[in-house]
Structure formats: structure tokens, C-alpha cells
Swiss-Prot record:
GO biological process: establishment of sister chromatid cohesion; interstrand cross-link repair; mitotic G1 DNA damage checkpoint signaling; mitotic sister chromatid cohesion
Entry keyword annotation includes Nucleus: yes
Binding site for ATP: S37, P38, T39, G40, T41, G42, K43, T44
Subcellular location: Nucleus
GO cellular component: chromatin; nucleus
Chain span(s) of sequence motif DEAH box: 368-371
Cofactor(s) annotated in UniProt: [4Fe-4S] cluster
Source species of the chain: Vanderwaltozyma polyspora (strain ATCC 22028 / DSM 70294 / BCRC 21397 / CBS 2163 / NBRC 10782 / NRRL Y-8283 / UCD 57-17) (Kluyveromyces polysporus)
Domain of life: Eukaryota
Record function comment: ATP-dependent DNA helicase important for chromosome transmission and normal cell cycle progression in G(2)/M. May have a role in changing DNA topology to allow the loading of proteins involved in maintaining sister chromatid cohesion in the vicinity of the centromeres. Has a specific role in chromosome segregation during meiosis II.
Protein name: ATP-dependent DNA helicase CHL1
Catalytically driven reaction(s): Couples ATP hydrolysis with the unwinding of duplex DNA at the replication fork by translocating in the 5'-3' direction. This creates two antiparallel DNA single strands (ssDNA). The leading ssDNA polymer is the template for DNA polymerase III holoenzyme which synthesizes a continuous strand; ATP + H2O = ADP + phosphate + H(+)
Record family assignment: Belongs to the DEAD box helicase family. DEAH subfamily. DDX11/CHL1 sub-subfamily.
Length: 829
């Protein structure tokens, strides 16, 4: 009997196959699962239904082991008897009975907790999203009106707390000590409620031994997960006589920038880094933050969250309503949750996980939209700083130091002077050594022939982090801007990351192992550090987690993940699965056009015959054969090449000829977005064609469903610029690595070719994957370049696209077949 996995609808066959693969991977102890499920196939719902079904089944299995083994369960965190009075000398039936009674009591306690959640839910407590940002909310903490005080009397706010450079710890002032004493006293007074909190928290931890961490790239994708999570109903893991209604304990995590409800911070600061430091500064101040409550307030917040499935906006509104900081309250609730959603950055940064107390041990980690995971890891662990940014930062530091040096303690003065000196070294190095983009440099080379031996990068970074000096300096510079020009203040207040934060990120890179990444010059006299071995950064996740599931709509070529993220994984500890699309086979045809000869190589792509004859005639014929109510979306390899084609067609009247058949819209690098106008024309059932750019604004994240795209065209192969600084460094790294491991020059040539092919085909898959969005959708894919016939290129296409490649390669035959296909669809619909 096939499992339904608690799917809210009748699942398609491919959805069942995907869910069976996920459930099987979790049951058999696989470490890695790489899954491709095309957009429009219900991937998110399949992921959560299969993983949560396994989670509940596993919990039931662990409880059964507890009962069968007299309270000893493998991989279970449920603590039964450790009472010395019940030793091994007692008869088994006595121990088993005693442990069983403890387990029963825990389950009854969980049932009481679920009833407690029922009580909260039945009070018709409503999260009002309109409360967000509404200062008229009567439930909010009342705040004093802040009168304007001349800047001269406010300068204390720009000073960091005294810093002890040897121990790298802040001095604890008397007021702080007093504050701690008060906190300790309050903790004693709240001991009863604290005990109750500990009971419910520990109970949830014990009965949820395995967690699911679901990470995705964007806020909208995480929001979609929450909406999908509301659809299925999962049975309780426990006997109904104990727990009849076991809710999903779902928790979305967000940043301070998303969740801060203190207007004194959010109205002043816009960058994530500045908001983080402003928050920490306020918490350390004598008055503290009125929303930063502990113990019972956070427990109440958690219980409200666990009454149902709430997205990040719900969490923010809940914090506003309860006068509780949503950021810290969600952090405190992590250990009690079953399912946690979080942005990529929280998952992929080990230091961030540590600071949030995110423990991945024995957990299931699901990374959605994982096609860009490698690039994201590289980006998170890379850094970049320009000569101009270094100079601007140095000027700011010097101004700040000149103003406050007499009021800074020795630790702050010494470290600020060291920072200024370090910036001076970097500025001098760039001025003396910059020659061209892509020029490799080493961290040691930067400090040669300097007195940098007195500079400890680790300690300077710690100083920036602990003293919050970046936030302090930025506050001061903003105040100067406000005093000098109120109009300029709005601009400075809303600027992006303060430069000292960017400098700190770059300084961290200087301490990275040489074999993991490279430093090199980029244009505009910039230095960039680029991570080249993402497997090292991903290793901690792989080591801790029970299973890591990477899922996406376009995961090919899958070999890229094994090569870059887990090269040492044992093959039998991994599983890969590429499911077909939900559409019938005849709803999508893929054509590779070889006649006429399309070849958009760098040397040939500007050939007048190719552009003005073959390419133009192709679009004329396609425009005629695709029904006028159906749109055409054509992708070009770059903005410059698309503009070249448009300019050529305009100069000889071809543009107007095509425009008379279909209204032309095209994407330009600095122009307005043509998508909305294109959609209006299609919705009015008029013929239109949209020319877009691979890697541009329209190639990812846009749904071209139904009539918006009855034909998608890929013009050429979108290879990256092989002369860019980043790609030169990556190419050199691949070559060095292969030769170091005993490979030949032929191996090097093959590997570098495959490297560029992979980048190209990932972009192709992302672009053509926009066309089909649901089971009744249909479209044709046209690949305009004879190189698509090469088996190494063809094999890197997504499986559902590759399997539908048609035998016809001649343009005339392809157009005849296309016409028949569209006529058939028109009749059937």
C-alpha cells in the first residue's frame, strides 16, 4: 500500500515518487539527497509532507523503543528513570513499569500543553498585521517624547564603552553590576513561573528529538513555505488516549531588521549591521529596551506562535501586540520547535548559527532553491573593498579620533590608532601595486615591508565587534551631516552598510587559510577575496546534520554539487532524484535547430547573415506559427548582444517588420522594466514578443505561465566572460588543483571546459524553466545553436527538458510541427 504522506490533495505520480525518495532517504540514513523537481510540480508541498510524515513516524518509533527496551531508546532524548533507587538489581518488570509511568506522565503533560494552546487559540486572539508600525497602538509601551537637545550635550552616545585590549572584554561598570543584581533578584521573584517555563520547554525538547531546518534564499519563498504548511493535517505521533491533537511546532526565524519593533532604532537605521549594533548597544545601556523581556513574556509569545502556522509578518505583529521583542523571543523558542525556517545566511554562516544557538545535531536540513547554493556560499564568505571606500573610512576614523581621543580609554585609543594604521597600509599597497583586474595577490604580500607585526587582525576584528565602534562612528558622522545639512541627513540615514562594517568583513578574510580562497585586484582599484573551496564552509553543516536535502527546480548538472560541496562523501550515503514534470509529454517539445546553421560563438555572432537573415527569419516564422494570443519569450546571452541585434534590425527596417507582426518588448541594462507592459498586451489577447537577457531581471523568479509564454527561445549559449577577474581566478585554481594532484594538461583542459559549460547550462536551465508552471500549461522550447547537439552540453539540460528533445532539426520541419501542435492545443482547449 502506497503512503499518502498526509498530502492535502491527491498527489500526482511524480509527487509520490519524490516523497517516497525523501522518506526513504531519511529512513535509510542517507547523508545527502539532491532532488530536482521542476517549478510547478508542487515541490514545496512534497518536501514538507514527506519530511514531516517521517518526523512524526520517527517520533512514534522512538517512543515504541522506549517502551520495548525498558526506557532505553537509541537516538532518543527522552529521559526516563535515572533514579538510583531503581537499579539494575530490580526485576525488569519493575523498571519497565516505572519507566512506562514516567513516559505516560510526560505524554499527559504534553496533552495538557496542547490544551493550553487550545485555550489561547479559542480566545480568538487575532494577530493584527495593521499594528505593525502603528504608533497609535494602545498596547504598545508608552515612550517619553524625546525633546531636541543640542549636539554638544549628546556626545556621550557616540562614545564606546571602555575597552580592555588585552582581555578584549568590556569593563563592567557599577551601573551594569547593579543591573545584573536587579536581574538576579527579579529572577528569584519569578522562580515559580520560571519553573513552569522550564517544564514546558524541557518537555518540548524531549518530545521533539529531531528538528527540520528549512532554508531558502528569499523572504517570499519562506513565506510560501508557511502558507503551504497550513494545508496538510498530520496525525499525532502519540496514542490518542494521551495526545489527540499534536500541533506542528513551527517557528520562522528572521533578522533584527525584519523583526525589530523599537522605533527608536528602526526609524534611524536601515542597514542590517547598524540595526544589530544599535540593538546590542541599547540592551547594554542602563534603560535597556522596553520590549526585551525574558522568561514568562517570551514563553507567552512562544505559546501564541505554536497555536498555528505563522509567517514572519505574523511574528512581527504578534510582538507588537504583546509588547515582546519578536527577534529575541523567537531565538528563545528554537529549542522547543519541530520545524524552523530560516534564510540562507543564518544556515550557511557557522558564526551566525552559534550566536543564535542553532544546533543542527541530528536534524534534517532542507535547502530549497538550492541551484544557487554554491554561489551563495561563495558570496557569503567573500569580501570586497575599494580604494575609495578605504580612504573614506580612514577619514571618518580620523575625524572621530580627533574629536573624542581625550575621552577614550587606553584600549579604545590604541585600537583606533591601529585601525587607522591598517587602513593606511591597505591604501598604500593598492596605490603601489594595482596593475589590472584579475591580478592575484597574497595576504602576506600586503604586509611585507611594513610594521604590521604590531597589528593583530583577530584582535582588531574583536575590537570592532565588541566595542560596536562602527555603529558609534556612523552615528557620529550622521549627526554631523544632520547639523550641517538636514536634507543630506535623509540620504546618509538611509545609506547602506556603514563602511567600517565592510572593512571588518574584509579584515576577517585576511585571516582565512590560503588554500580556501584567493585575493585579487578588480577594476576601480579594488581588492576582492573570493572563496574557492565552498566544501570547507559547508562541512560543519554536513558533519552535524542527520541528513541534508538539497532541492530545486533546476539542479542539473548535479555533479557540480558533489565536486564543490561534498567531494569526500561516500556514494552510498547519498541519493539523487530528478522527477519528471507533471505535464503530459505532448505539452512540451524541445527543439535543437541545426538548419540553418545557428552558431553564436564570440567570433561568429555578429555575422550580418546570422543576425539579419537567419535569426530574423526565425523570429518571423515563429511569430506566425505561435498563436497570436500566446506570447514568445526569447533569451539572449548578454545585454550588449541583445542591444547589438536590436540596433542592427532598427538600422535596416527589420525591427519594424517584426513589430508589425508582434509588438516587441526588450530588456535593457539601464532601461525600465518591460514586463508589465508585455503582460498587459498578452492579457488583452494581442500578439507580443519579449526579448530578455540570461542572468537579467527576467531570467529568474518570474512566472511566464499560460499565454505569457507559449514559446521560449534560447539564443546561443550564454557562456560567461572568461576574461573577468573572478573567472580567471577560479580557472587558475582548478588548473593548479588538478596539476597538484597529478593530473595532466589534458585533464586540466577537460576540467576547465566542463567548468564553463556548467556555468552556462545552469543559466540555460534557469531561463527555460520559466515556461511551464502547472499541469495544464504547455509550451515549446527552441534552442538556437548547433552546439546544443553536443552530448556533453545536452546532458547538462534538466532531465524533463532533455527527455522531450524532438528528432526534427530543420527549421522548416520544426515550424510545421509547431504549427500542428499549437492548432491541436487550441482545438482541445
Amino acid at each position: 500500500m502506497l503512503m499518502s504522506f498526509n498530502h492535502p490533495y491527491q498527489p500526482y505520480e511524480i509527487q509520490l515518487q519524490l516523497m517516497q525518495c525523501i522518506y526513504g532517504a531519511l529512513s535509510s540514513g542517507k547523508k545527502i539527497a539532491i532532488l530536482e523537481s521542476p517549478t510547478g510540480t508542487g515541490k514545496t508541498l512534497s518536501l514538507l509532507c514527506s519530511s514531516i510524515t517521517w518526523l512524526r513516524d520517527n517520533k512514534l518509533h522512538l517512543l515504541s523503543q522506549n517502551l520495548n527496551n525498558g526506557g532505553i531508546a537509541i537516538n532518543s532524548s527522552i529521559e526516563l528513570s535515572d533514579d538510583d533507587d531503581f537499579s539494575d538489581d530490580e526485576p525488569n518488570w519493575v523498571n519497565e513499569s516505572y519507566n512506562s509511568s514516567i513516559l505516560d506522565n510526560k505524554l499527559l503533560a504534553l496533552n495538557d500543553y496542547e490544551k493550553h494552546l487550545d485555550t489561547i487559540a479559542n480566545k480568538h486572539y487575532k494577530i493584527d498585521k495593521n499594528l505593525i508600525g502603528n504608533d497609535n497602538n494602545n498596547n504598545k509601551v508608552k515612550r517619553r517624547k524625546i525633546e531636541h537637545i543640542p549636539v554638544g550635550f549628546e556626545e556621550d552616545e557616540f562614545l564606546p564603552q571602555d575597552y580592555i585590549s588585552d582581555s578584549e572584554e568590556l569593563e563592567q561598570t557599577k551601573s551594569e553590576a547593579l543591573s545584573n543584581e536587579v536581574k538576579a533578584l527579579l529572577a528569584k521573584l519569578d522562580s515559580k513561573s520560571n519553573d513552569e517555563q522550564t517544564t514546558s520547554t524541557e518537555l518540548l525538547q524531549e518530545l521533539n528529538p529531531v528538528k527540520i531546518f528549512f532554508a531558502s534564499r528569499t523572504h517570499s519563498q519562506l513565506k510560501q513555505f508557511a502558507s503551504q504548511l497550513k494545508l496538510p493535517k498530520f496525525k499525532s505521533s502519540f496514542d490518542e488516549k494521551f495526545v489527540s491533537n499534536e500541533r506542528l511546532k513551527y517557528l520562522p526565524l528572521g533578522s533584527r531588521k525584519q523583526l525589530c519593533i523599537n522605533k527608536s532604532i528602526t526609524s534611524k537605521w536601515k542597514s542590517t549591521e547598524a540595526i544589530n549594533d544599535a540593538c546590542k548597544e541599547l540592551l547594554q545601556s542602563e534603560k535597556g529596551c522596553p520590549y526585551h523581556n525574558k522568561n514568562t513574556s517570551n514563553t507567552l509569545f512562544r505559546d501564541h506562535v505554536f497555536t498555528g502556522v505563522h509567517d514572519i509578518e505574523d511574528i512581527l505583529a504578534l510582538g507588537e501586540s504583546l509588547n515582546v521583542c519578536p527577534y529575541y523571543a523567537t531565538r528563545d523558542s528554537i529549542t522547543s520547535a519541530e520545524i524552523i525556517t530560516l534564510p540562507y545566511q543564518y544556515l550557511l554562516s557557522e558564526s551566525t548559527r552559534d550566536s543564535l544557538n542553532i544546533d543542527l545535531s541530528n536534524s534534517i536540513v532542507i535547502v530549497d532553491e538550492a541551484h544557487n547554493l554554491i554561489d551563495t556560499i561563495n558570496t557569503i564568505h567573500s569580501s570586497h573593498i575599494s580604494l575609495q571606500e578605504l580612504k573614506t573610512c580612514q577619514i571618518g576614523l580620523q575625524m572621530y579620533f580627533a574629536k573624542f581621543k581625550s575621552r577614550l580609554n587606553a584600549g579604545n585609543r590604541v585600537n583606533l590608532l591601529k585601525l587607522i594604521k591598517l587602513l593606511d597600509i591597505l591604501i598604500e599597497y593598492i596605490n603601489k601595486n594595482f596593475k589590472k583586474s584579475g591580478q592575484e595577490i597574497s595576504a602576506n604580500e600586503i604586509f611585507n615591508n611594513t610594521n604590521a607585526d604590531t597589528l593583530n587582525i583577530h584582535k582588531l576584528n574583536q575590537f570592532i565587534k565588541v566595542s560596536k565602534i562602527a555603529y558609534k562612528i556612523d552615528t557620529y558622522l550622521n549627526s554631523l551631516s544632520k547639523e550641517s545639512d538636514n536634507e543630506n541627513n535623509e540620504e546618509s540615514k538611509n545609506k547602506s552598510t556603514p563602511l567600517l562594517f565592510k572593512v571588518a568583513s574584509f579584515l576577517s578574510s585576511l585571516t582565512n587559510p590560503n588554500e580556501e580562497g584567493k585575493f585579487f585586484f578588480e577594476k576601480n582599484k579594488s581588492i576582492k577575496y573570493m572563496l574557492l573551496e565552498p566544501s570547507q564552509s559547508f562541512k560543519s553543516i554536513l558533519d552535524e546534520a542527520r541528513c541534508v536535502i538539497l532541492a530545486g527546480g533546476t539542479m542539473e548538472p548535479i555533479s557540480d554539487f558533489f565536486d564543490n560541496l561534498f567531494p569526500d562523501i561516500i556514494k552510498d550515503k547519498s541519493v539523487t532524484f530528478a522527477c519528471d514534470h507533471v505535464i503530459p509529454d505532448d505539452n512540451l517539445n524541445t527543439y535543437i535547430i541545426e538548419e540553418p546553421k545557428f552558431e553564436f560563438t564570440f567570433d561568429k555572432r555578429q555575422n550580418p547573415e546570422l543576425v539579419n537573415k537567419h535569426l530574423f527569419q526565425f523570429f518571423i516564422k515563429l511569430s506566425v506559427n505561435v498563436p497570436p494570443t500566446g506570447g514568445i519569450v526569447a533569451f539572449f546571452p548578454s545585454y550588449s548582444y541583445l542591444q547589438f541585434v536590436i540596433d542592427n534590425w532598427r538600422s535596416n527596417g527589420l525591427f519594424d517588420k517584426l513589430n508589425k507582426i508582434r509588438e516587441i518588448f526588450y530588456e535593457s541594462k539601464n532601461g525600465s522594466d518591460p514586463l508589465d507592459e508585455y503582460i498587459k498586451v498578452i492579457e488583452a489577447r494581442n500578439p507580443a514578443i519579449l526579448f530578455a537577457v540570461v542572468g537579467g531581471k527576467l531570467s529568474e523568479g518570474i512566472n511566464f505561465q499560460d499565454d505569457l509564454c507559449r514559446a521560449v527561445v534560447m539564443t546561443g549559449l550564454p557562456y560567461p566572460n572568461v576574461m573577468s577577474g573572478e573567472l580567471l581566478i577560479k580557472k587558475n585554481h582548478i588548473e593548479t588543483k588538478i596539476l597538484k594532484n597529478g593530473g595532466s594538461k589534458a585533464d586540466v583542459s577537460c576540467a576547465t571546459k566542463d567548468f564553463f559549460d556548467t556555468i552556462c547550462m545552469k543559466a540555460v536551465n534557469q531561463s527555460v524553466g520559466r515556461a511551464i508552471r502547472h499541469i495544464d500549461d504547455y509550451s515549446n522550447i527552441y534552442l538556437l545553436d548547433q552546439r546544443y547537439s553536443n552530448s556533453k552540453i545536452k546532458d547538462k539540460l534538466s532531465q524533463w527538458v532533455r527527455k522531450r528533445i524532438q528528432p526534427e532539426t530543420n527549421l522548416e520541419l520544426i515550424m510545421e510541427k509547431s504549427n500542428r501542435t499549437f492548432q491541436t492545443k487550441k482545438t482541445s482547449n
